[in-house]
């Protein structure tokens, strides 16, 4: 069975729209919550859309930067961005109103390889933009922020990055899509963040040497006006075109209780980062 049929054809997908009103830490807590629900067979697969204002989501490796406080001071005091540490992925990414995040949560244990889980997201994104005259490539864009094997790019310019996380029998695959605005300006901001947070110090972990010109938004790459709302519609149409069956089952009481636990963990993780900077 091909992956499109396995994950979409006749498969129920529960759509959660969190495109407004949430704080970033809440988003990561919700993904863990739904991941566990799917893993325990008490929820259909989940697709969740989320958008956040002016936040840099740092990875685990970023929390070990030698001058992290200086980097965060630059983001907050000079640029007006908040910074938090997430629970998936290793390096920082930029979120704002022009960046659409999509999370797919589905059941999977060790038999579901990391590459297979990433490919499910790639298939969906490819379907969303199949009417555009472009080739979407999957390969690491070395000089982007948060470079990875499953970076998505057009003509060598990265517009999206994918991470995944596994929680209690469920898999969450998360993508950020740089839709509106300037991808290179976002990359310049991250380049400057690392300059402040490293100050030229040599570290065991190799942080990205960012070249802003290797990143761009879909608006730029497709050479047309496209909004995050447009892409949200493309997402839902793509799931239906692949044979998926959408529903909008509300969050259950049990999920709200589990969410509280995961949210507390996110708060604790970020408190540790703040304490380390004192």
UniProtKB/Swiss-Prot annotation:
Its EC number is 2.3.1.204. The reaction proceeds via a thioester-linked acyl-enzyme intermediate. GO terms for molecular function: lipoyl(octanoyl) transferase activity. HAMAP family: LipL (MF_02119). Pathway: Protein modification; protein lipoylation via endogenous pathway; protein N(6)-(lipoyl)lysine from octanoyl-[acyl-carrier-protein]. This is Octanoyl-[GcvH]:protein N-octanoyltransferase. SUPFAM superfamilies: Class II aaRS and biotin synthetases. GO terms for biological process: lipoate biosynthetic process; protein modification process. It is an enzyme of class 2 (transferase). Belongs to the octanoyltransferase LipL family. It holds the Pfam family LplA-B_cat. Keywords: Acyltransferase, Transferase. The record marks 158 as: Lowers pKa of active site Cys. Residues 41-247 form the BPL/LPL catalytic domain. It comes from Staphylococcus aureus (strain NCTC 8325 / PS 47).
